[in-house]
Amino acid sequence: MLCLAGAAFISCVGTAPTKEVHLVDSLNQVAYTYRYKNLDSSYHAASKAYQEVGLYSQGKAEACNNLGFCAFMRMDFEEAEKYYQTVYNLTKNELELLVADIGLMKIYQRTALNKEFYDYRNSALRRMKRIAED
């Protein structure tokens, strides 16, 4: 009996609690909903989602994409780049990575970093192809 309990405990290590997932997902949804309506509200919700993450790295990646968008809209390209780059260390989710690719493309287009723009454009195209295959 002790072995089974130990095995069950080990299999759950690293899994985000349901309550955390629901909270972070709802905050990210609010951030996304307000992105073109009220940028401050979008930023506040995304920032709260980022802070509330314990184990839910997927939710943190989405929060980073939302924070990157807010920073981009404020024309704080360095901050936006930092958030988008963070996504690559948090998740393997192709959709979140695609959002980060496109966010970085927008930054590099605006800042005339053409090589970087095309690097992330090619990454986004490959990612879209993989997503379409799935």
Each model region followed by its residue ranges:
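Bacterial N-terminal signal peptides
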Residues: 1-8
